[in-house]
Amino acid sequence: MTLEERVEALEKELQEMKDIEAIKELKGKYFRCLDGKMWDELETTLSPNIVTSYSNGKLVFHSPKEVTDYLKSSMPKEEISMHMGHTPEITIDSETTATGRWYLEDRLIFTDGKYKDVGINGGAFYTDKYEKIDGQWYILETGYVRIYEEHFMRDPKIHITMNMHK
């Protein structure tokens, strides 16, 4: 392999590593905005061509606005949520496309309303596709398949002492 070929291979490898890191940051922003209920900012993580498949394909949406409108209506301020994406497996498929798999662990606590004191714990596998537009990565397709989900009544003696949404 010539020096030029080695440099070219290293540049390609470096770009792939940068792309993987950018995708990790993108998914991190998605989860942060989801739990922070920052719907406008969450929308900036989504491709204009987004397709979702949440809850084993029961919830399918085809635009950033559809996604955030649904999330806004289904995640009221009375709900504390914590979505954690772990162990990413990201493959750069081309200069402008990538695929990712994430392990999701999520916890929800309802502090008011119809579901007051209900808790939900769950786990799922996310599968995403990403596209790069004008040098920026976006979520093109996202969805998860549940491993498990449990609902339970929280002990009334346990009190939430801090809630960023109140």
UniProtKB/Swiss-Prot annotation:
It catalyses: 7alpha,12alpha-dihydroxy-3-oxochol-4-en-24-oyl-CoA = 12alpha-hydroxy-3-oxochola-4,6-dien-24-oyl-CoA + H2O; 7alpha-hydroxy-3-oxochol-4-en-24-oyl-CoA = 3-oxochol-4,6-dien-24-oyl-CoA + H2O; 7alpha,12alpha-dihydroxy-3-oxochol-4-en-24-oate = 12alpha-hydroxy-3-oxochola-4,6-dien-24-oate + H2O; 7alpha-hydroxy-3-oxochol-4-en-24-oate = 3-oxochola-4,6-dien-24-oate + H2O. Keywords: Bile acid catabolism, Lipid degradation, Lipid metabolism, Lyase, Steroid metabolism. GO terms for biological process: bile acid biosynthetic process; bile acid catabolic process; lipid catabolic process. InterPro entries: NTF2-like_dom_sf, SnoaL-like. The keyword Ubl conjugation does not apply. Its EC number is 4.2.1.106. Pfam families: SnoaL_4 (PF13577). Induction: Induced by bile acids such as cholate. SUPFAM superfamilies: NTF2-like. The keyword Lipid metabolism applies. GO terms for molecular function: bile-acid 7alpha-dehydratase activity. Pathway: Lipid metabolism; bile acid biosynthesis. GO terms for cellular component: cytoplasm. Homodimer. Functions in the bile acid 7alpha-dehydroxylation pathway, which forms secondary bile acids via the 7alpha-dehydroxylation of primary bile acids, and is carried out by intestinal anaerobic bacteria. Catalyzes the dehydration step in this pathway, yielding a 3-oxo-Delta(4,6)-bile acid-CoA intermediate. This is Bile acid 7alpha-dehydratase. The lineage of its organism: Bacteria, Bacillati, Bacillota, Clostridia, Lachnospirales. The gene is baiE.
